[in-house]
Curated annotation (Swiss-Prot):
Belongs to the MDM10 family. Component of the ER-mitochondria encounter structure (ERMES) or MDM complex, composed of MMM1, MDM10, MDM12 and MDM34. Associates with the mitochondrial outer membrane sorting assembly machinery SAM(core) complex. Lacks alpha-helical transmembrane segments, suggesting that it resides in the membrane via beta-sheet conformations similar to those predicted for other outer membrane proteins and porin. Keywords: Membrane, Mitochondrion, Mitochondrion outer membrane, Transmembrane, Transmembrane beta strand. It is found in: Mitochondrion outer membrane. One of its GO terms (cellular component) is SAM complex. Transmembrane segments: none annotated. The keyword Aminoacyl-tRNA synthetase does not apply. It is a multi-pass membrane protein. HAMAP family: Mdm10. One of its GO terms (biological process) is phospholipid transport. This is Mitochondrial distribution and morphology protein 10. Component of the ERMES/MDM complex, which serves as a molecular tether to connect the endoplasmic reticulum and mitochondria. Components of this complex are involved in the control of mitochondrial shape and protein biogenesis and may function in phospholipid exchange. MDM10 is involved in the late assembly steps of the general translocase of the mitochondrial outer membrane (TOM complex). Functions in the TOM40-specific route of the assembly of outer membrane beta-barrel proteins, including the association of TOM40 with the receptor TOM22 and small TOM proteins.
Length: 459
């Protein structure tokens, strides 16, 4: 689960049209979210408040071994108007999960907004207690496609009392590149990522059978000047969506030739509420291998009894997998009136407006009319255009689904462990609790490695 400060940082990127998925470090972000999620340790309480559209503060307390905590502050020159607290935020925004890759999409801004975005900046600082540990971050937009990112840590327990990392990033729909310098070991780095695919601005009649199929190829190079040690890794990511079901999938292949390590992942969103991930690691120097499997399962809020007849009728129409679509709270979201004449509905004169996914752009890019799902199988339009409608409708259903909780799980054969994480709502709080169980290598008996619970509140 994201902290509120991480959530605000993602909203800042979205409001300034900065594509996080187009960065080399996030090539395997989906598999990391489904397999390498963290388990809370002990009990923790996070309380955050957003005083204005430009500033926010946060405090956390935990009792892991000793009572400790932190104070944080964030300032954004760009107003973050579409952010929400833990009471209203959707779980899709609060929890890291499957990412649909769209490197060619960029938000639209007016001339006034563009000038503000080009000068946008974000300041973040956190102080830990007890102790004197500090951390800070600065994000400064240089132009519409470039930004400066600076991260600093001040801790007496690390070498020289602290370290600083500077990123100069350029992010365009076709490629991205980063120049990195770290004061630790005088480390120099370069990352690049190039996307092979067709932009979404292409005419719909020319869209191939698999829409938004993108192949991303990237690499990173490192050199530590003090230790005179190099580093190298490469990665390939393939992302696509099926036109028959609209379900996206992502495959990645990463390789570190110096260490002899290769890793492949396969991630697929099997329905609106479920995702499955698998990862295979192999080292050609030691011949060691490992297989990891993870899943993510969302739970819907129980729909009102008024809509049960409607969903029963819709399941009789197999034009798309209606049994995987989320129940919605407003008939106007469905786009069509129910066909069951035995049930009457009282529609309001004006449809109610609601914001479900603040991180997604508030335009019509995803928000198509879902009534296009209920067309007759005898399509009188091109198959590619109808396939595009199915994919957009599936994505629209994911964004507008009202989930009450999410369950994550992962296991690793080589590590002989199982992790479970549950994130849900309790009144105005977001609750995250989980457990990690390992097998003792000597007795082969299960033992609890980590267990905890986190309560988060933001307003």
């Amino acid at each position: 689960m994201y902290t509120h400060m991480e959530y605000l940082q993602r909203c800042f990127y979205k409001s300034t049209s900065w594509n996080e998925d187009n960065i080399y470090a996030n090539v395997t972000a989906t598999s990391q979210a489904l397999l390498d999620f963290s388990i809370p340790s002990g009990a923790k309480l996070d309380v955050s408040t957003q005083a204005t559209d430009h500033s926010a503060s946060s405090m956390s307390l935990s009792n892991m071994h000793t009572i400790n905590g932190s104070l944080a502050y964030l300032f954004s020159s760009t107003p973050l108007k579409n952010t929400m607290g833990t009471r209203d935020v959707s779980l899709q925004d609060a929890v890291a999960g499957f990412r649909i890759i769209e490197p060619f999409f960029s938000g639209t801004h007016t001339k006034t907004d563009s000038s503000d975005v080009n000068r946008a900046s974000l300041l973040y600082g956190r102080m830990y207690f007890p102790g004197t540990a500090l951390e800070a971050m600065l994000i400064k937009r240089i132009s519409a496609s470039a930004q400066l990112l600076v991260k600093c840590i001040n801790n007496p327990h690390i070498r020289k009392g602290g370290t600083m990392i500077v990123y100069l990033q350029e992010n365009t729909p076709r490629f991205s590149r980063e120049y990195i310098y770290s004061t630790n070991e005088a480390l120099f780095g370069f990352r690049c990522l190039y996307n092979f695919g067709k932009p979404t601005k292409i005419s719909p009649a020319l869209i191939p059978k698999f829409d938004n199929s993108v192949v991303s190829v990237g690499a990173e190079f490192w050199y530590a000047a003090l230790g005179m040690s190099p580093g190298l890794s490469t990665a390939v990511r393939y992302s696509t969506r099926s036109t028959s079901t609209g379900k996206p999938l992502t495959m990645t292949l990463a390789c570190n030739p110096i260490l002899g390590h290769i890793s492949s992942t396969y991630n697929v969103k099997t329905s609106v509420s479920s995702t499955v991930c698998s990862k295979y690691d192999f080292n050609w120097f030691s011949y060691a291998s490992n297989l990891s499997i993870g899943f993510e399962l969302y739970n819907f809020f129980k729909p009102s009894h008024v809509f049960k007849h409607y969903h029963a009728d819709q399941r009789r129409n197999p034009s798309i997998h209606h049994d995987t679509l989320a129940p919605v709270a407003d008939p106007y979201v469905l786009g069509t009136r129910p066909t069951n004449n035995s049930v009457s509905y009282a529609f309001p004169e004006k449809p109610r407006k609601r914001v479900v996914n603040s991180i997604q752009n508030l335009d019509d890019y995803y928000h198509i009319n879902p009534s296009r799902l209920h067309r007759s199988p005898a399509y009188d339009v091109d198959d590619d255009v109808s396939g595009r409608s199915v994919m957009e409708a599936f994505q629209n259903s994911v964004n507008e689904s009202n989930f009450s909780s999410v369950l994550k799980g992962s296991t690793s054969l080589s590590d002989r462990m199982v992790k479970l994480l549950w994130v849900g709502r309790y009144k105005d709080f977001l609750v995250s609790t989980g457990i990690k169980v390992n097998l003792n290598p000597f007795t082969n008996l299960p033992e609890i490695n980590k267990i905890g619970v986190t309560f988060s509140y933001a307003c």
